[in-house]
Design a protein with these regions (language model features):
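Active-site neighborhood of glycoside hydrolase catalytic domains
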Residues: 625-661
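Aromatic-residue-lined binding/catalytic grooves and analogous aromatic/hydrophobic interfacial grooves
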Residues: 198-619, 637-639, 645, 656-659
């Protein structure tokens, strides 16, 4: 079976998923984020500090098994119950893990078989007795998923570093492995008032219908929603997060009431090079997760009980305005509204945090690099930034926090805003990728300053001007076509539309079909503007360490499917990043000509099934050489719709060369 293209895949996976007045704080020297050493205690401490112990790569935490069939310490999403709260009894060099149930975490010699990692010879289990020799805590040098620590079992020889066993997407037992593995890294979180829960308790909005009918909406956060797939790890992102994008730079919105995550990507952030690599080879590279902005509520406006729940919770993506929204009301009657856009004119992601009462916004904002990127984040003057280099590509990201009212302080913990009326967050990111350059990179020396300037310009405009500019730009594209099915009304959360669709539930079924059509056009605009690259297998959105098929450009149908809506639905300009990519690689670079020669042809060009953004290919299905003919048909289709003779003169040599291959 052919893999689903991104636009179709995300339609199914995301919809089917329930589918400035600033009082300046201190301006210290640049601060760099680092792992904070947890507090150790003695066995007799009356008020020990407990922690949620989270494996950075999976985001799941140590807990006693809930299946009732074993005594393993397993990994689950945080709920904050007693079995997930651990004190560290002893010293950094010799301590015990003891949870609130009074159980120790010990190294077992009784192996366990797991489908996600095979046989785990020494799983961690719960015991009433201490671990002989205890554990040692060291700062990890592996920062692929953020700063953290590694735990050493002192009495164990050989592989003695505590490790998330098996596939990080589904693994939930703990074993031991070598030093420096990214599955080793853990962090320690103070349960605090949240008691370790992922989010405030929320009660969904009732009797709601969006102002604009073409809106995906939900009555619960993406972080706590029940998964259709039953999967772990990135499934909440895959099934529930809402995508926004300016065509090149985009974000996935989770809508947490307590801790709001804005996970972001940039289309050109790739590891790898232009080489031909073995299937799965490192030289081929992959699409990388750029990182996340976290906005943590410090006001304590809501809580985790029925009495302190956030009510009227709403999370939506308005396709008519390309605006994300999260809204809820606290027990004291204050309504909090958060809006999100990815502005193509400004080339930034912007988030606006507000309340209907003054002085109610108290939050801490942090910038966290993702995937294989540096964890060296610098905080200074209400700004966070990081930059670095992959195999070929250099990258830079900047977050600015601009409060109105209240106070703001920048520390190594992040940017803390207290008692503000509203807060604007600007996020910008970019790389030195340039498809017109023979080396695929250009302007490296100005990258950091260019990204900084973009963020500063957006911050200077302010939220209202940014939003108006964004809306005018987006509406000029999305508003070209109107498709309406009589009798439709958007009165059910999108996941409920999915649930009832197979029953043929009349107007609700038609509403879902109308949303599908609109969502396809929305995604085309959001993932295919700017740089001359097509949207990949996941468009421009990925929170994964290892995305499926590297989130690459698959030429055997997937990238073509991404662009089937472009011309027929009056979005011809969205087709151009794909068409210009074809023209550039066919005419201005050598790689595709080399692949043709590899197939015994003296003329022409071609590419294989799997392609990165540097003209590189993998060895997977490298007998598939007919992509050139299919690509040429896209070049011709655009001319048929636009009758643009200047365009035809430019791309005709690439079409001719493709035919000469045959």
């Amino acid at each position: 079976m052919k893999k689903l293209s991104f636009l179709f895949f995300l339609l199914v996976a995301s919809i089917t998923a329930f589918a400035a007045n600033v009082t300046a704080g201190k301006k210290a020297a640049p601060l760099r984020a680092a792992a904070k050493m947890p507090t150790f205690c003695s066995e007799t401490d009356a008020n020990p500090q407990y922690y949620i112990v989270t494996f950075n790569r999976s985001g799941t935490c140590m807990s006693e098994s809930t299946n009732g069939t074993d005594n393993c310490i397993r990994l689950y999403n945080s709920t904050g119950d007693a079995s997930q709260q651990w004190k560290l009894v002893g010293t950094q060099d010799n301590f015990q893990f003891v949870n609130k149930n009074g159980n120790y975490a010990v190294v077992s010699s009784e192996s366990i078989y797991t489908s996600e990692g095979g046989t785990n010879p020494n799983p961690i289990r719960a015991s009433k007795s201490a671990q002989p020799g205890g554990y040692k805590l060291v700062v990890s040098s592996c920062m692929d998923n953020g700063a953290g620590f590694e735990v050493i079992a002192n009495s164990k020889s050989g592989n003695n570093y505590m490790n998330l066993w098996g596939d990080p997407r589904g693994g939930n037992t703990i074993g031991f492995w070598k030093v420096g593995d990214q599955n080793n890294v853990v962090s320690f979180t103070n349960p605090g008032a949240m008691n370790g829960a992922l989010d405030y308790k929320t009660v969904g909005v009732t009797g709601y219908s969006p102002t604009n009918m073409l809106t995906l909406w939900y009555d619960e956060p993406a972080t706590t929603a029940q998964l259709y797939s039953g999967g772990q790890g990135y499934s909440n992102w895959m099934e529930y997060a809402l995508p926004i994008g300016d065509g090149q730079f985009g974000a996935s919105l989770f809508g947490g009431a307590y801790k709001d995550e804005i996970q972001f990507n940039e289309k050109t952030l790739w590891s790898g090079t232009a080489a031909r690599s073995p299937y799965g080879g490192k030289g081929y590279g992959k699409y990388e997760n750029f990182g996340s902005v976290f906005a943590e509520d410090l006001s304590g406006c809501c809580g985790t009980t029925d009495e302190t729940a956030a009510t009227g919770y709403l999370r939506q993506l308005d396709l008519t305005t390309a605006t994300g929204l999260t809204q809820f009301t606290s027990p004291e009657g204050v309504t909090y509204t958060r809006q999100y856009i990815a502005s193509n004119p400004a080339r930034v992601v912007a988030a606006h945090y507000a309340a209907d009462a003054k002085g109610k916004i108290s939050m801490r904002f942090t910038l966290v690099p993702g995937s294989v990127l540096t964890s060296n984040v610098t905080y200074e003057n209400e700004e966070a930034k990081f930059n670095g280099k992959l195999d070929l590509i250099s990258y830079s990201a900047v977050m600015k926090v601009i409060p109105n009212g209240g106070t703001v302080e920048t520390t190594e913990e992040g940017i803390t805003v207290t008692d503000a009326d509203e807060v604007l967050v600007i996020l910008a990111g970019g790389t030195d990728y340039d498809i017109s350059s023979p080396t695929y990179i250009a302007n490296t020396s100005s990258l950091v300053s260019d990204v900084e300037a973009r963020a500063t310009a957006a911050a200077d405009k302010g939220w209202r001007a940014l939003y108006d500019e964004h809306l005018a730009d987006y509406a000029s594209l999305f508003g070209r076509l109107d498709f309406h099915l009589d009798g439709t009304a958007n009165t059910l959360p999108t996941n409920k539309l999915i649930d009832t669709y197979n029953s043929g539930n009349g107007d609700n079924a038609l509403m879902l079909e109308q949303l599908y059509f609109a969502y396809g056009r929305y995604l085309e605009i959001a993932s295919s503007r700017g740089v001359d690259l097509p949207s990949n297998l996941q468009g421009i959105w990925s929170n994964m360490v290892q995305p499926a098929w590297n989130a690459d450009i698959h030429s055997n149908i997937n990238v073509q499917m991404n662009y089937w809506p472009a011309e027929p639905t009056n979005l011809s300009e969205m087709h151009l990043p794909f068409l210009n990519y074809i023209w550039n690689l066919a005419e201005n670079h050598t790689e595709w000509k080399q692949w043709a020669q590899m197939q015994g042809q003296d003329r022409g060009w071609t590419c294989f099934t799997e392609n990165n953004i540097f003209g590189g290919v993998s060895s997977f299905k490298n007998n598939y050489v007919i992509a050139n003919a299919w690509y040429a048909s896209h070049l011709w289709q655009h001319y048929r719709y636009t009758l643009d003779r200047d365009y035809l003169k430019r791309v005709f040599p690439a079409m001719l060369s493709a035919s000469q291959f045959w």
